[in-house]
Amino acid sequence: PYRRQRQMCIRDSITISSTYIRTLVAQGEMERANQFLGHPHTLTDTVAHGKKLGGTLGFPTVNLRFQPGVLVPAHGVYATRVTFENGESRPAVTNIGVRPTVDDGDRVTVEGFILDFQGDLYGQTVRMEFYKRLRGERKFPSLEALKDEVMRNAEQTRAYFSTQP
């Protein structure tokens, strides 16, 4: 009988495995996880209707639903890239979490504010690539404070992608 042996991959005294990479993603350590994956961690789904609050604040978002068992990064705000069905892609600021400033519930959402984009993506399938965690999710004292922070996160995302190939 043959016994298949896997070759161990060790880097910086750490055994690199799918379990280790999943742990990195679950902790929001996207840059390190992506190094080991060889590509960005990605969620692909159909854009769903949300509460449209982002649009009223000046930040329309694409809302992704995800199936149970899908590996979603830790709650927080990320620099992401969204690719549309036509192949075009744009940087986005994406929040994963329970939206504590505007919701009292515990339903986890994935919402991406696509930078420099106007259009209707409802019903389209998009691919969202996660590159860097900008900050953890937090509750803001007002919608105005939330808007200011989204603007800062948008600038951080622009700066991040301006240095990437």
Segments predicted by a language model, with ranges:
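Phosphate/ribose-recognition catalytic cores of enzymes acting on nucleotide-derived substrates
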Residues: G50-P165
